């Protein structure tokens, strides 16, 4: 049965092979089960795209998740959301033709800047809020908003911010959301408490991002996930001196309304956009780059170390899986239709989330 059974009426199924329409160039990234290529249109010379190539063998049993991501991306046409242009379902691979974004990750750009102000942070968060408000108006919850998924469109100094990676996104019409997902440190209390949740989880994540943008370090941190989650559930964070002494009370008030433990009392995207720190002129304009950049560099170094550690752990788990008696039994006899070899969760997570 074809992978893409239903298509957006505005997005007809391509009738040709992807390589008839695009020239594949450099590999931009490699994940556990996919690669992203730089591709140029053959009909519009010079027009470049990012093409995600997904191995169908690795996709088996997870088609519904990919279809959900594609369904979401087709719904969302916004200046601050990475666009999906076409999909190709071919014999061995599924291809997603995406908008090419070349400006780099949010934190990397801030560290590289010569100056950076609270007003700059306000402008960044405004763009994120506008895009997420658009998602919410269209019944979509992102569920994994974090700095790694906020990219600059290009290298221009005034480049816009783009939201990417909709692998964990969900539409409200697909049923009650109660699955624990997201990224530790950015996930909302109600998700950790395994309560039904909705759009408010995205607002919490934006609050965490805003906090980091103003000081360079996260509001919640512990080496132990259990302790980290306990902090988040209780909403235990501080505006520490001396780092927050140079930040406006308006910014602190704004963050407090986004990181409110009660989702019913938490700001919506629209109410956040109306707050003076976003819509007015209460954001300070003095340079905070030095303080923020110092902490961001430490956070980036730690994140990159964890990324390398998790990749190594995934490889070790896969090697153990291949050597295990269960895996050997599966290789030595054909499983019946009710048997399925389960890959380690970390591998599945790496595939459905952003390519490391």
Swiss-Prot record:
Disulfide bonds: none annotated. GO terms for biological process: signal transduction. Its cofactor is Mg(2+). Residues 298-319 are annotated as: Calmodulin-binding. Residues 22-278 form the Protein kinase domain. ATP binds at residues 28-36, 52. One of its GO terms (cellular component) is cytoplasm. The keyword Kinase applies. Residues 278-318 are annotated as: Autoinhibitory domain. Pfam families: Pkinase (PF00069). Keywords: Allosteric enzyme, ATP-binding, Calmodulin-binding, Cytoplasm, Developmental protein, Kinase, Magnesium, Metal-binding, Nucleotide-binding, Nucleus, Phosphoprotein, Serine/threonine-protein kinase, Transferase. Activated by Ca(2+)/calmodulin. Binding of calmodulin results in a conformational change that generates functional binding sites for both substrate and ATP, and thus relieves autoinhibition and lowers the Km of substrate binding. Must be phosphorylated by ckk-1 to be maximally active but this does not appear to be required for activity in AFD neurons. The modification Phosphothreonine is found at residue 179. This is Calcium/calmodulin-dependent protein kinase type 1. The autoinhibitory domain overlaps with the calmodulin binding region and interacts in the inactive folded state with the catalytic domain as a pseudosubstrate. A motif (Nuclear localization signal) lies at residues 2-7. GO terms for molecular function: ATP binding; calcium/calmodulin-dependent protein kinase activity; calmodulin binding; metal ion binding; protein serine kinase activity. It is found in: Nucleus; Cytoplasm. The keyword ATP-binding applies. CDD domains: STKc_CaMKI.
């Amino acid at each position: 049965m074809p992978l893409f059974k239903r298509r957006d009426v505005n997005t007809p199924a391509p009738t040709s092979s992807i390589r008839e329409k695009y020239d594949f160039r450099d590999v931009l990234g490699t994940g556990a089960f996919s690669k992203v290529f730089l591709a140029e249109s053959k009909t519009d010379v010079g027009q470049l795209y990012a093409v995600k190539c997904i191995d169908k063998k690795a996709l088996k049993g997870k088609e519904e998740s990919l279809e959900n991501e594609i369904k979401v991306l087709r719904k969302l046409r916004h200046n601050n959301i990475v666009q999906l242009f076409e999909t190709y379902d071919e014999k061995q691979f599924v291809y997603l033709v995406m908008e090419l974004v070349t400006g780099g990750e949010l934190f990397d750009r801030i560290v590289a800047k010569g100056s950076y102000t609270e007003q700059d942070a306000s402008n960044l968060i405004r763009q994120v809020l506008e895009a997420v408000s658009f998602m919410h108006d269209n019944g979509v919850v992102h569920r994994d908003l974090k700095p790694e998924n906020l990219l600059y469109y290009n290298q221009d100094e005034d480049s816009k911010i783009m939201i990417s990676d909709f692998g964990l996104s969900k539409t409200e019409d697909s049923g009650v959301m109660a699955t624990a997902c997201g990224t530790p440190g950015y996930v909302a209390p109600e998700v950790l408490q395994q309560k039904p949740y909705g759009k408010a989880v995205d607002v919490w994540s934006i609050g965490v991002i805003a906090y980091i943008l103003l000081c360079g370090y996260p509001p919640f941190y512990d080496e132990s996930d259990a302790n980290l989650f306990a902090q988040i559930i209780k909403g235990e964070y501080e505006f520490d001196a001396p780092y927050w002494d140079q930040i406006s009370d308006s910014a602190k008030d704004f963050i407090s309304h986004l990181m409110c433990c009660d989702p019913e009392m938490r700001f919506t995207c629209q109410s956040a956009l109306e707050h003076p720190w976003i819509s007015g002129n209460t954001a300070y304009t003095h340079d905070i780059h030095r303080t923020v950049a110092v902490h961001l560099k430490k956070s980036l170094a730690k994140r990159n170390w964890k990324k390398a550690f998790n990749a190594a752990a995934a490889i070790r788990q896969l090697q153990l899986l291949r050597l295990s008696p269960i895996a050997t039994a599966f290789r030595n006899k054909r499983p019946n239709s009710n048997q399925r070899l389960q890959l380690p969760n970390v591998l599945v997570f790496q595939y459905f989330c952003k390519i490391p």
